From Swiss-Prot:
EC number: 3.2.1.21
Organism for this UniProt entry: Arabidopsis thaliana (Mouse-ear cress)
Tissue: Expressed at low levels in cauline leaves and flowers.
Binding locations of a beta-D-glucoside: 49, 153, 198-199, 343, 413, 458, 465-466, 474
The protein's name in its UniProt record: Beta-glucosidase 16
């Protein structure tokens, strides 16, 4: 009897080992030397999401302060970024975390209103803000971490919104140029990678079409409680001004600073990757149009000096602005690298073009969905918009290479969220799976010949996630918002540490290999 029991126990044990091994084998096993020797690994945050100290040391309000504090109902949990991760006061601890994990670089943004509280040079420079960023940059360099700086990550000074409508005003372009030049002057001796704008498409889409993000504008027929707006015209004006602002910032950097500071400058663009809903010709064209209205919307002007033909042919009634010959020339080649922010993929379905209630979204004549025949494109994350589909990052990189003359690329954001369950949770195997599968796809793209130079995980730590507030967590580091903003390394941070030291990554959770 005892022998039968031991035999049964052995069979159960072997079966469990087999299941565990099967799960383990689904995660790619990566080493740092699977990537080029000079490949940069880093992590990323943004100013409003993590700095806090929103009303301290002379910082002026941004549109995100106004949006979240005056209209808390527009944030899922009624929160704001006034304290956030308190990185303004805890930056040394954050730099130590980057060093401890083993990252080469840190991508962060500068709060425009922290150094120019009224948004303009005429309104005065806040020396305390300059000092903060000098201290952060110097601390990073002292730990061997490269600063990779974004100039504008959505937090426009509120003074400019009030003065001329912010991104809707032509004045924005020159004000951004002046702000960018101030940053080049103050920090460019140490900062060698600059990003002008982060995700201009998100600013256009969620700030002026859906109204989900500051300044919260949309058409009344879309959402009656929007703070004004016209989603048929304003998005195109905003996108145009953002492109021109990018162009003038790159121009001043190249003409006055690049030769001596020896840095490089680019832009960070985002999109889901779009797959045809069916094999029909109409749906294949719809997938192309969907990308034209998101990623190509900004790539086409900065590579070729024009808007994508799909936009030109679909946006009626003169609503799509045009570039002057001088503007077109300025925009052509206005990058040393392109940042790619990728999280998820979608199916694109051709639909009839709208004849009423027109928005920039309806102009594309595409319906974007996350499932086909009842089957999601990939497993769901903490946010309903994030369906996990690693192959999309490779296909997006290939698109950038072959349509846009093989540019230098960085993955400037890639990550996954989980719901905030209200207690310390460090065993984030889902996040490890996400990173492993996406990094494998990046490695595959490099082996095909895509010129990817680096990868930044979003995010270094849990932070204020815009309209979702603190209801979801993207971080490699857990932040306890109830206990002094204490930081704890999650399992994913330790996985990265092993990867960056050359060990295989991997535990026993799985995500479908796609």
């Amino acid at each position: 009897m005892r022998g039968k029991f031991l035999s049964l126990l052995l069979l159960i044990t072997l079966a469990c080992i087999g299941v565990s091994a099967k799960k383990h084998s689904t995660r790619p096993r990566l080493r740092r030397n699977d990537f080029p020797q000079d490949f940069v690994f880093g992590s990323a945050t943004s100013a409003y999401q993590c700095e806090g100290a929103a009303h301290e040391d002379g910082r002026g309000p941004s549109i995100w302060d106004s949006f979240s504090e005056k209209f808390p109902e527009k944030i899922m949990d009624g929160s704001n970024g006034s304290i956030a991760d308190d990185s303004y006061n805890l930056y040394k601890e954050d730099v130590n975390l980057l060093h401890q994990i083993g990252f080469d670089a840190y991508r962060f943004s500068i709060s425009w209103s922290r150094i120019l509280p009224r948004g303009t040079l005429k309104g005065g420079i806040n020396q305390a803000g300059i000092e903060y960023y000098n201290n952060l940059i110097n601390q990073l360099i002292s730990k061997g971490v490269k600063p990779f700086v974004t100039l504008f990550h959505w937090d426009l000074p509120d003074a400019l919104e009030n003065a001329y409508g912010g991104l809707l005003g032509d004045e924005f372009v020159n004000d951004f140029r002046d702000y960018a030049e101030l940053c080049f002057q103050k920090f460019g001796d140490r900062v060698k990678q600059w990003t002008t704008l982060n995700e201009p498409y998100t600013m256009v889409h969620e700030g002026y079409i859906t109204g989900q993000k500051a300044p919260g504008r949309c058409s009344n027929f879309y959402k009656p409680d929007c703070l004004g707006g016209d989603a048929a015209t304003e998005p195109y004006i905003v996108g145009h001004n953002l492109l021109l602002a990018h162009g003038v910032a790159v121009k001043v950097y190249r003409e006055k600073y690049q030769a001596t500071q020896k840095g490089e400058i680019g832009i960070a663009l985002n999109t889901a990757w779009h797959y045809p809903y069916s094999d029909s010709y109409a749906d294949r064209l719809a997938a192309t149009r969907a990308t034209a209205f998101t990623f190509d919307y900004f790539m086409e002007p900065i590579v070729y000096g024009r808007y994508p033909i799909e936009m030109v042919s679909h946006v009626k009634d003169g609503r799509l602005p045009t570039f002057t010959p001088e503007e077109s020339e300025m925009l052509k080649g206005s990058y040393d690298f392109i940042g790619v922010n990728y999280y998820s993929s979608l199916y694109a379905k051709d639909v009839p073009c709208a004849t009423e209630n027109i928005t920039m979204t309806t102009d594309s004549c595409v319906s974007l969905v996350g499932e086909r025949n009842g089957v999601p494109i990939g497993p769901a994350a903490g946010s309903d918009w994030l369906l996990i589909y690693p192959k999309g990052i490779r296909d997006l990189l290939l698109h950038a290479k072959f349509r846009y003359n093989d540019p230098v690329l960085y993955i400037t954001e890639n990550g996954v969220d989980e719901a905030n369950i209200g207690k310390i949770f460090l065993n984030d195997d889902l996040r490890i799976d996400y990173y492993a599968h996406h990094l494998k796809m990046v490695s595959d793209a490099i082996s095909i010949g895509v010129n990817v130079k680096g990868y930044f995980a979003w995010s270094l730590m849990d932070n204020f996630e815009w309209s979702e507030g603190y209801t979801v967590r993207f971080g490699l580091v857990f932040v306890d918002f109830e206990d002094g903003r204490k930081r704890y390394l999650k399992k994913s941070a330790k996985w990265f540490r092993r990867l960056l030291k050359g060990a295989h990554g991997g535990t026993n959770e799985q995500v479908a290999v796609i």
